UniProtKB/Swiss-Prot annotation:
Biological process according to GO: pantothenate biosynthetic process
Matching HAMAP family: PanB (MF_00156)
Family named by the database record: Belongs to the PanB family.
Function: Catalyzes the reversible reaction in which hydroxymethyl group from 5,10-methylenetetrahydrofolate is transferred onto alpha-ketoisovalerate to form ketopantoate.
Keyword list, A-Z: Cytoplasm, Magnesium, Metal-binding, Pantothenate biosynthesis, Transferase
Cofactor requirements of the protein: Mg(2+)
A GO CC annotation given for this chain: cytoplasm
GO molecular function: 3-methyl-2-oxobutanoate hydroxymethyltransferase activity; magnesium ion binding
Enzymatic reactions: 3-methyl-2-oxobutanoate + (6R)-5,10-methylene-5,6,7,8-tetrahydrofolate + H2O = 2-dehydropantoate + (6S)-5,6,7,8-tetrahydrofolate
A Pfam family recorded for this sequence: Pantoate_transf
Listed name of the protein: 3-methyl-2-oxobutanoate hydroxymethyltransferase
Species for this entry: Rhizobium rhizogenes (strain K84 / ATCC BAA-868) (Agrobacterium radiobacter)
Length: 273
């Protein structure tokens, strides 16, 4: 149910059934106000651990905590009426054991009310994904470039250029599908490989830096809106440039405060006559 309890939101089963129908529209969301703006237009909203970089200024997603993800998941859930909401499991919250993953995934679902969790990993995480899905936890898989592993993967770069890399990602995708994931995020791979994976698996692929042939697309909302300026990946398109708009608005506010023209009479309360 939605935050108002009046409408039904998309389920993970409905997202899975969208494969081969129409493209799945996805974006990241971290706060209630942004979730409200995105919700009417999106099939799925991801409370991504990218919030560590976008909101908190971290250099990577590694420093994000479970408590941070739960707090932002709660905020996003207050703003949705339609979209399926998935919460990222942060680094260190699921890699130790499948039991640890289940314990923390259940905490996310119970404390946020979200529809599922996302975790990174391929063949090495398939047993964990199967353990979760067998116990009622919907899992959104993630293969290709994995930001939580960037420190050991040689940085941010497109993967699958070599046959060895491509074959590993193919095996990863198949393993996560067979483990019971309802969808698969494919990140930072060469276009032909993402296209091939989309055709070879029976669950939806949602691409970021992948291929237009994927069953859906996702971007970090702050990237898409032109709000995050630390760096711009090749795969990002700015559908708006809000950073200059915000800067100009703050500049105008500052000038009016200094000139004592704000607040004006229309912004203040007067005694009754």
């Amino acid at each position: 149910m939605s935050a108002t309890g009046l409408t039904r939101r998309n389920t993970t089963s409905q997202i899975e059934a969208m494969k081969g129908t129409r493209p799945i529209v996805s974006l990241t969301a971290y706060t209630t106000p942004i979730a409200r703006l995105l919700d009417p237009h999106c099939d799925l909203l991801l409370v991504g651990d990218s919030l560590g970089m976008v909101l908190y200024g971290m250099e990577s997603t590694v420093g994000v905590t479970l408590e941070m993800m739960i707090a932002h998941g709660q905020g996003v859930m207050r703003g949705v009426q339609k979209a399926c909401v998935i919460v990222d499991m942060p680094f260190g919250s699921y890699q130790e054991s499948k039991e640890q993953a289940f314990r923390n995934a259940v905490r996310i679902l119970k404390e946020t009310g979200s529809d599922g969790v996302k975790l990174e990993g391929g063949e090495e995480m398939a047993e964990t994904v199967a353990f979760l899905t067998a116990r009622g936890v919907p899992v959104f898989g993630h293969v290709g470039l994995m930001p939580q592993q960037v420190k050991t993967a040689g940085g941010y770069r497109a993967l699958g250029r070599s046959e060895e890399e491509a074959d590993k990602i193919r095996r990863d995708a198949k393993a996560i599908e067979q483990a019971g994931a309802f969808a698969l995020l494919v990140e930072g791979t060469v276009e032909t490989l993402a296209r091939e994976i989309t055709a070879s698996v029976g669950i939806p692929t949602i691409g970021i830096g992948a291929s237009p042939a994927c069953d859906g697309q996702i971007l970090v909302s702050d990237d898409m809106l032109g709000l995050f300026s630390d760096f711009k990946p090749r795969f990002v398109k700015h559908f708006a440039q809000l950073a200059p708009t915000v800067s100009k608005a703050v500049e105008a506010y500052a000038e009016e405060v200094k000139a004592r023209t704000f607040p004006g009479p229309e912004h203040t309360f007067q005694p009754k006559k």
